[in-house]
Amino acid sequence: MAGARPGVHALQLEPPTVVETLRRGSKFIKWDEEASSRNLVTLRLDPNGFFLYWTGPNMEVDTLDISSIRDTRTGRYARLPKDPKIREVLGFGGPDTRLEEKLMTVVAGPDPVNTTFLNFMAVQDDTVKVWSEELFKLAMNILAQNAPEHVLRKAYTKLKLQVNQDGRIPVKNILKMFSADKKRVETALICGLNFNRSESIRPDEFSLEIFERFLNKLLLRPDIDKILLEIGAKGKPYLTLEQLMDFINQKQRDPRLNEVLYPPLRSSQARLLIEKYEPNKQFLERDQMSMEGFSRYLGGEENGILPLEALDLSMDMTQPLSAYFINSSHNTYLTAGQLAGTSSVEMYRQALLWGCRCVELDVWKGRPPEEEPFITHGFTMTTEVPLRDVLEAIAETAFKTSPYPVILSFENHVDSAKQQAKMAEYCRSIFGEALLIDPLDKYPLSAGTPLPSPQDLMGRILVKNKKRHRPSTGVPDSSVAKRPLEQSNSALSESSAATEPSSPQLGSPSSDSCPGLSNGEEVGLEKTSLEPQKSLGEEGLNRGPNVLMPDRDREDEEEDEEEEETTDPKKPTTDEGTASSEVNATEEMSTLVNYVEPVKFKSFEASRKRNKCFEMSSFVETKAMEQLTKSPMEFVEYNKQQLSRIYPKGTRVDSSNYMPQLFWNVGCQLVALNFQTLDLPMQLNAGVFEYNGRSGYLLKPEFMRRPDKSFDPFTEVIVDGIVANALRVKVISGQFLSDRKVGIYVEVDMFGLPVDTRRKYRTRTSQGNSFNPVWDEEPFDFPKVVLPTLASLRIAAFEEGGRFVGHRILPVSAIRSGYHYVCLRNEANQPLCLPALLIYTEASDYIPDDHQDYAEALINPIKHVSLMDQRAKQLAALIGESEAQASTEMCQETPSQQQGSQLSSNPVPNPLDDSPRWPPGPTTSPTSTSLSSPGQRDDLIASILSEVTPTPLEELRSHKAMVKLRSRQDRDLRELHKKHQRKAVALTRRLLDGLAQARAEGKCRPSSSALSRATNVEDVKEEEKEAARQYREFQNRQVQSLLELREAQADAETERRLEHLKQAQQRLREVVLDAHTTQFKRLKELNEREKKELQKILDRKRNNSISEAKTREKHKKEVELTEINRRHITESVNSIRRLEEAQKQRHERLLAGQQQVLQQLVEEEPKLVAQLTQECQEQRERLPQEIRRCLLGETSEGLGDGPLVACASNGHAAGSGGHQSGADSESQEENTQL
């Protein structure tokens, strides 16, 4: 749950090994008293340590799964035969007196109640000890029970061992193992092995490779294919070395791991994995991993869902006892219900072997003549077991699976001083030095002294029993008084002995030894008539005077008297049952009590003032729930120093359990459950205590142990100092989930703090497929786990009718990321042979949405710095050199240091934009200045709040995107202008040449006519007029021809410029919207920074006030400190509320300003279009005059200096010279607008 030591843990777990003696086998006589049978067998163990097997009388091999073995016993702890015939055959009663040393009993079963006993007697001496120790060591091996890579090998081994009389493997055994779909099995057998149902297989022909080939035919794996495709196999049936290495480092690696302590996988290590798991030599030679090898890797030891450190003893065991959750049992002796169940000594063995470190003993007075105290459930019809047998069983098994201390929780109803003395003597003689009687020197029983640690108490047994502090003289030490019947009810928990009942009272353990108290009517059953037995006090043993009683004894005596006076005799005790009838302890039993002294709980404040860590209290679950609801933080504080025990209420007559997580959440250590009932609470308890080496002790989270920290288990926010987790679980597929052809569904639950608990995520039900169902569904998200070290994840599979298949409990803080196989367990947390689930998990630290940018910058700082540099370069192209330098410094700051508002700057004229194509919009002068002024500096909110204004259009026109667009549009217009200019100049040259030629011909024609005719002057004049008229018409045609070309070109250019204008406006709108989005994001960051700054100012103010208050007198200081804290809270709440209101108003102002910018953009567009249209129209109207001036040499005021005028001014009468001039004009004027 918590408490892993810092740094890299040195793994202490060892893999299972089978010694040669067990592999070779030994001769034993197997006897069964019920069947009156005895057979000589040879016990063997397979080389992997999976199965114990022997050949029975019918020549068939019997097997026993090693993981089902719960204990092995030899000597006097082994079962002895009672049948005279079997005893005679085994040699009992003969000369050999060492026969007991040859006996061995193997206890096996799926849970602590349903156990079987296999009895053996060794033929040879010194054989039993080796077999017993090695079998128990293999059965308890933690690595063997957490090895998914051995699942298929184990199934293969079982088939190989179960041969028939001919020494062959029956095919029916294969069909039985995979009975969920026999048709698929038969098809796979035919395709893979060529055997039919009625045949058998020679063991040497049934290799592991053939078995795996059969499984590949039996199980199609579309889930693995999909994973390979997602990794990057791209339809190929293999992964390359680089792909495998990337997959492991990116998908399978926890990003939270330190790269120095846990470096990423290197190529050489990835190659070793391929060599280990790839069965195909061709792929192996090419450093490739096939689908089969990839599936093997997913189930390999390197890819466990949990690190081995979580399974190993990795927690600090040197903290006080109160710092641990302790595996605890209630009514340990019962095997079934609370009313008529069977009591069993074996249950104490099984509970302790299961890791329980606190067992309960309900002891009652024995009957004459033996007067042997016994254990039973008082006032019910449950059976009895002798106390001595129970203590011997505890002594035998207390430290077989865990060396850490065991607590014996006595509920003492023995109202006989003689029998209590016998109880104490049994404890001393049976436990010997293991029984802790005197407190340790380092940990005296004094106020303020913490409890010793589990490490200090290794191998010790502690007694929890009512301890009566008696005066040293004046009263016989052996006196014992039973409580009167009218004091039979307790108001809060158990009586001053803090003992625990469990059920309503129906009968009596003995008609002459138990108090006649019964509240069986609470459960509707008839009360049994009993004769009340008088207490020793009524018989004349009165208390002596306490004038010589020490202060502590007097104080405790007064407390007990107070309890008796305040008890309500009429209040029913249905929940608390027999605790009220417990008797006072004698000196003999009191002497055995030290660090676990039960006292009646009064209040948390009273316990804090007493400050006695060795005192503890017990709470029935209903009273504990009341305290948990009313005072959760005080409950946590109490459990930091003292022990508390929670036990089920008495109305749970079916031995059901409450959910232990409720009380773990407040740090209760001894959360006792009914171990015989494997319901969900007990399953959770068994799963949780599997970790930390199954020691029975789990270190509580640090926040629940530190005296300087307070913890609220009902918190819904992240606790300062605790790293919350985020977890995502996707159930992909299952394998061999049931032996029936049914649908399967999977539930995923989380147990932890109330805010962390989630129930129930559930997949859909597969359609009649329990072999290999595939669930392609969305993952289950646990976005925020506030206290991951106290949270557990449960993944459970069920058949469609709700029948339990298997489950697994995983500590959230230790779950690894990636794809993993999860082998399922039964209700008692024992591993199942084949059922498994393939899941995908993502485990990470929880990061609030507001801090995602910071987290990304920390995770990938190189990428973050590169992005900042890139942004700085982009800004440098838009703003001046000095501002660029300042912006670069700003971008290189951490995200928490950046300004929240976007600063505006004056736009820099674009050198390419020497003729503006749209008028500038209304310009504002935004600033990011503080709202505070000299008159407002006293206003705390105004001094913190900064104003943010929208960026104006003029500044956004200088955006890089706009500059780039204008550059492209200018280039486009220049190209179009060049094209038109070339056509116009060429036509102008031709027209000028034609005019020059016509002019020359016109001058010569009148002279020739005069010479030839010389007749009439009038005719000559008339002819000149006609020539002049024709020349003018020629001129007009020339002008019109050039005018039509230029007007068409002007219209094309106008259309292109209008198109550019629309593009520019659209792009400007996108820039505006992007700027607004960025501004809102930065405004959100600015809000958080302003809140933090406000809180810092308030905290500083509070600290200053506290420093001043500490200088005052003590009584004034406390009052003033209280007032300072109250004022600080009020001022903080009000100030943050005012700041949030001001921030909201600022947000609204910014939104309104941004809307004005957008409206300005919308209103501006038609004006720009009209202006551009007018400008183009004016240029088009000037074209006729330009052309006439160019062609005819006319001059007129107001004519533009167009290219045609330049052509005309250079003169074209010189022919080629005119052409050269036209070319020069083109090169000189190509950048001038028409």
Curated annotation (Swiss-Prot):
Catalytic reactions of this protein: a 1,2-diacyl-sn-glycero-3-phospho-(1D-myo-inositol-4,5-bisphosphate) + H2O = 1D-myo-inositol 1,4,5-trisphosphate + a 1,2-diacyl-sn-glycerol + H(+); a 1,2-diacyl-sn-glycero-3-phospho-(1D-myo-inositol) + H2O = 1D-myo-inositol 1-phosphate + a 1,2-diacyl-sn-glycerol + H(+)
Biased composition (Low complexity): 486-513, 924-934
Annotated ranges, domain C2: 706-834
Annotated InterPro entries: C2_dom, C2_domain_sf, EF-hand-dom_pair, PI-PLC_fam, PLC-beta, PLC-beta_C, PLC-beta_C_sf, PLC-beta_PH
Cofactors: Ca(2+)
A biological process term (GO) from this entry: phosphatidylinositol catabolic process
Domain PI-PLC X-box: 315-466
Location of the active site: H330, H377
Keyword Lipid metabolism belongs to the record: yes
Positions of modified residues (N-acetylalanine): A2
Sequence segments annotated as region (Interaction with SHANK2): 1231-1234
Subcellular locations according to the entry: Cytoplasm; Membrane; Nucleus
Stated role: Catalyzes the production of the second messenger molecules diacylglycerol (DAG) and inositol 1,4,5-trisphosphate (IP3). Key transducer of G protein-coupled receptor signaling: activated by G(q)/G(11) G alpha proteins downstream of G protein-coupled receptors activation. In neutrophils, participates in a phospholipase C-activating N-formyl peptide-activated GPCR (G protein-coupled receptor) signaling pathway by promoting RASGRP4 activation by DAG, to promote neutrophil functional responses.
Protein name: 1-phosphatidylinositol 4,5-bisphosphate phosphodiesterase beta-3
Taxonomic source organism: Rattus norvegicus
Lineage start: Eukaryota, Metazoa, Chordata, Craniata, Vertebrata
Gene, per the UniProt record: Plcb3
